[in-house]
Amino acid sequence: MNQVDYLRISLIDRCNFRCQYCMPEGVELDYILKQQLLTNEELLTLIREVFIPVGFNRFRLTGGEPLLRPRVVDLVSAIATLPQTQDLSMTTNGFLLAPMAQNLYNAGLRRINISLDSLDADTFDQIIGNQGRSRWQQVWHGIQAAHSVGFDPLKLNVVVIPGVNDHEILDLAALTIDKQWHVRFIEFMPIGNVDLFGDRGWVSSAELRQQIRDRWGLTESQVRGAGPADVFKIPGAKGTLGFISQMSECFCDRCNRMRLSADGWLRPCLLNETGQIDLKTALRSGTSTAQLQEQVRHLLRMKPEINFKGRDSGIVGTYTRTMSQIGG
């Protein structure tokens, strides 16, 4: 198993979208109250005095939608300037990004992933649960702003939903030809909206790669990320194509991450809540950071056994939160 040195940090569970694959349709979510969220000071204490000492040095800020977090630019700056931070990135839906991109870059953020599940405005609005004025154009402006500012790599995340956006695979892949953008196709998975998954199912990465291979050809890329994506390239393209195959190919043995929820729960596996630790309550009750370090070390030792490997047998993992509440 890889060294676990990568922490995904959910800054907030609220989101200004309601994506089909992330939140169950028609279900009211119990959002975390403000006083239950980790404060910036608590989060920085945990990063400096717990996570870094046990070996974490790469951090990704997620949500909900992380740009809804008050003082998010200040938080980015504080994490980026820690001498032990080797990598700081963010995943966003891009809706609020355009006016914030330069400030985020100036604060030290260099890598960004933006969700772009469709190039068609109507399909996009259907996926994000938008009922009013289309939000596609504002997200596209956010992507263009991130590109202009200099974020590199700039990655576009696509969750492939059968019968909804799977007909756009070639159009989305073509974005990598003329720009140094990295499009990542993510297999739809049964967390966040189990009913939709049951209705729609999923398309394997192998099928997507074959579509692209038949159109342009496809080669393995020399660019290799630190995450679970298998990276390929259209011959002659400036960017790359990543395939995250959590349904068709179990990559538990290469998992290098844990997840910290906005209310302070440290979770060892996306698909399994077993073993998770309530760091916020412990910190607020006076538990020393040395004791918290030991708890995290124990969870790190347990992680290979906790990583969920039951998909092949059709077993569903143990989880009670939606994808938006976990942070993806």
Swiss-Prot record:
As one GO molecular function, the record gives: 4 iron, 4 sulfur cluster binding
Q: Report the top EC class in one word.
A: lyase
Entry EC no(s): 4.1.99.22
**Pathway in which the depicted protein is active:** Cofactor biosynthesis; molybdopterin biosynthesis
Question: Which keywords label this protein?
Answer: 4Fe-4S, GTP-binding, Iron, Iron-sulfur, Lyase, Metal-binding, Molybdenum cofactor biosynthesis, Nucleotide-binding, S-adenosyl-L-methionine
The signal peptide annotation in the UniProt record is: none
Listed under subunit, the entry gives: Monomer and homodimer.
Concerning PANTHER family, the annotation shows: MOLYBDENUM COFACTOR BIOSYNTHESIS PROTEIN 1, MOLYBDOPTERIN COFACTOR SYNTHESIS PROTEIN A
What is the recorded name of this protein? Answer: GTP 3',8-cyclase
